[in-house]
Structure formats: structure tokens, C-alpha cells
Amino acid sequence: MTCPVIELAQQLIKRPSLSPHDEGCQALMIERLEAIGFTVEPMPFGDTLNFWAWRGEGQTLAFAGHTDVVPTGDEKRWDNPPFEPTIRDGMLYGRGAADMKGSLAAMVVAAERFVAANPHHQGRLAFLITSDEEASATHGTVKVVEALMARNERLDYCLVGEPSSTERVGDVVKNGRRGSITANLHIHGIQGHVAYPHLADNPVHRAMPALNELVAIEWDRGNEFFPPTSMQIANVQAGTGSNNVIPGEMFVQFNFRFSTESTDATIKQRVEELLERHQLNYSIEWRLSGQPFLTARGALVDAVVNAVEHYSELTPQLLTTGGTSDGRFIAQMGAQVVELGPVNATIHKVNECVHAADLQLLSRMYQRIMEQLVA
């Protein structure tokens, strides 16, 4: 007997939905949701497909996720073609198996089972799905959230299916995420001959003391929910490629992952004060990818913990570590946001895979969360 979760996951993996393309994944999900009474509103923006679907009314629990996947890398290094889902030794292989087509399949099947058992459920069950999460994330969830907020849509709880687990399904639940802000810094000098440094102004030499000070700063000490804010230099570029030319400009890109103890405004202020103090001739551009958010213990966290304890017989850790997710946009609606998904050990890697049994377990957890919040 085939498992409906695995079957749907395989159908989704077969579609090579490299971000921001969907390749028919959402149509497959929409067909299943409409069959059980969901109203579906396609919400395309630019080159991105999104949809918002709901069933029932009242207190709202939304399941959020993305149909797009990252590139496969060298397909010759895969044991099987990345878009030909394969089950081997109990593992489901394929690009997106863990991030996050397995979660999408678990969500849809959970909704089917929930509606069959609770055809007249009290609250509203919803889905917010995008094909633009892995790449720019500019025309996906952020745009849908803007549209929903503009018409005063209510969203009480949101379960994001990102692969949160580390060793066993549910061992880690993300109840928040750090903020992320990136600086693109250009330090301007004067190009010249290395034999005549007095006729030039080397921006690399100028910048080094400032950068040394920058990387040594303790931005904050974090708190009980967040680790300390971290800063990492990601890219440095300077020079013409010749060994006898002093560069005229230096580019440095650095990123902050910041806790609720810092703000993007205070980070900008401290960085720019440091650059001014070192008397650098510079220009700087900032890109804020997301603010930090935290969902404290409450109805959603309690429901998720209950579901994990019921099916996995373990108490999950509540963490805010890792990268950003679309939860940062949904949190702006005032919703409680929690991430629960498969084990993340192989995400974005060659031979991405997930235990088939884990997806079955995850679907049962999702169903139990629905039963606790909107039945």
C-alpha cells in the first residue's frame, strides 16, 4: 500500500522548480486543496507564483512553505538524478526532499485527513505558498503578506515547514529567527604606481585598522532566546590584478545576524561612526533582509510541543538559530510563528534526502496541531 505523503512528495520532487520557478507544483497542491473545500486565490507577482488558500472562518492557522528549490550542483555527483525521486534503504532522495517539498506533502495530506475527520471545523485553516524563497525572496511571501495586510486579513498562527530538525523529527523547533542586515561598503582611494605611494592613496591600507576594529566589536550579549549578534565579512575586492598598481577603490561586504538586543538602526549608527572616526572616504549601502522575531510560549508553541511529544516521545528544543526564513515576513502580521520540519542534515547538498517515515510522522504532527487549534 502506497503512502499518500510519500506519493505526493515524489510528484512534487519530479518537478524541477528551480527558484523562482514553480513548474506545476502549486497546481498540484491547489487541485488537492480545492477537492476538500478550500477557496484558492492565486497571487502572482513578477516572475513568482504564490497562492493563498483557506477553508472555514474565524481564528486562523496558516501553513506556509515554498515550492522552489536551490540548484542541484553537478548532477553527475548524485547517485540518482536529482529530479527523479528515489527511495533507497528507507530514504527518499531528490532535490527538495527535505527543503521543502516533503513538508508540503505532509501539510496537504494532514489537511485532507483533518477535514475528513472535522468537516465542520470551528476555525479557519489556510495555506500560504510561494515559489520565491530560495533566491531573492522579493516577489514571494513578502508580497502576499503586504496584500493580506492591506485588506486586514487576520492570521493568528502560522506553521512554517522549513527543515528545523537536526537528528530526529521535532528535536528542534524554531520559535523565532535573528534579523539580517548586509552592508556594501566602498572605500575610495587614489590609484597609482606601487613605486610612488606618495602620489596615491591606498584604500586597503586605510581600511585595515577600521576593519580590525569592526570585527572585534561585541555588539550585544544576546539573551535567553537569542545568541549574541554576530558580524561576518563575506566579500572583499580590490586591485586591478597587477602587482604594480595601487588600487583606487576597495569593496567590503559584511553581514550581521542580530538579536532582539540590537536594532538595524543602532548597528548602522555604530558602523558609520567607526568609519567616520577612521576618517575614511567611503560610501555605504545597507540591505535589511529581515527583523528578528520571537514567538513566546502560547497556544501555537504549546500545540507544536504537544504534537512532537505525542508522536516522537521527545521534548523539542525551542531555538532561534540558523538563517532567515519567510517566517520573518509573516510575523509582521502579528501572528505567532513557529517552524517545524524534517531533519536538515542534507539540505542544499548533493543527494539531498529525508527518511520516508519522517514525512509520515511529520504529517501526523501537522494534523494534531490543526486539531488543537482550529477543530
From Swiss-Prot:
CDD domains: M20_DapE_proteobac. One of its GO terms (molecular function) is zinc ion binding. Pathway: Amino-acid biosynthesis; L-lysine biosynthesis via DAP pathway; LL-2,6-diaminopimelate from (S)-tetrahydrodipicolinate (succinylase route): step 3/3. Zn(2+) 2 binds at residues 99, 134, 348. The active site is at residues 68, 133. Keywords: Amino-acid biosynthesis, Cobalt, Diaminopimelate biosynthesis, Hydrolase, Lysine biosynthesis, Metal-binding, Zinc. Zn(2+) 1 binds at residues 66, 99, 162. InterPro entries: ArgE/DapE_CS, Bact_exopeptidase_dim_dom, DapE_proteobac, Peptidase_M20, Peptidase_M20_dimer, Peptidase_M20A. Binds 2 Zn(2+) or Co(2+) ions per subunit. GO terms for biological process: diaminopimelate biosynthetic process; L-arginine biosynthetic process; lysine biosynthetic process via diaminopimelate. It catalyses: N-succinyl-(2S,6S)-2,6-diaminopimelate + H2O = (2S,6S)-2,6-diaminopimelate + succinate. Its EC number is 3.5.1.18. Its cofactor is Zn(2+); Co(2+). It is an enzyme of class 3 (hydrolase). The keyword Zinc applies. Gene3D superfamilies: Zn peptidases. Homodimer. Belongs to the peptidase M20A family. DapE subfamily. Catalyzes the hydrolysis of N-succinyl-L,L-diaminopimelic acid (SDAP), forming succinate and LL-2,6-diaminopimelate (DAP), an intermediate involved in the bacterial biosynthesis of lysine and meso-diaminopimelic acid, an essential component of bacterial cell walls. This is Succinyl-diaminopimelate desuccinylase. It comes from Serratia proteamaculans (strain 568).
